[in-house]
A protein has these predicted regions:
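Active-site rim elements
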Residues: 1-5, 69-70
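Active-site-proximal alpha-helical segments within enzyme catalytic domains
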Residues: 4-25, 80-96
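Active-site Gly/Thr loop motif
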Residues: 38-91
Length: 115
């Protein structure tokens, strides 16, 4: 069992990430209410690093210590990740990458855009 079975391409993963980065807006149309996106990114009562199906990059407990605390991500089976970084206006899609390698990968991308 793979948790529900959302099977989409990397391009569609990126579109989901861009939609979240844009707070629900796509090409001038509100697809998802901005309030819902804000709720998705609000920590739940059980964990300060989890919202509605989105992981939050809390400075102390987040997966990406070198990334802004405003970053958030979705992670699925096989460490398929949609990483969204509002501070840098960045969406990263990575698929079938070792989970422990992902923080270094994100840090390399962030370093490349800082220079």
């Amino acid at each position: 069992h793979w948790g529900g079975g959302l099977w989409i391409s990397s391009l569609d993963h990126a579109r989901v990430g861009q939609l979240m980065l844009n707070k629900g807006w796509w090409n001038g149309r509100e697809i998802i209410p901005e309030k819902w996106v804000d709720e998705c990114l609000t920590p739940c009562p059980l964990s300060p690093i989890y919202g509605y199906l989105w992981w939050l990059n809390d400075a102390k407990n987040g997966m990406f210590p070198g990334a802004p605390s405003s970053a958030f991500y979705a992670m699925g089976v096989g460490t398929q990740i949609i990483y969204i970084d509002p501070e840098n206006e960045l969406v990263i899609v990575a698929r079938w990458i070792e989970k422990d390698k992902m923080p270094d990968f994100v840090n390399m991308v962030l370093a490349s855009i800082e220079n």
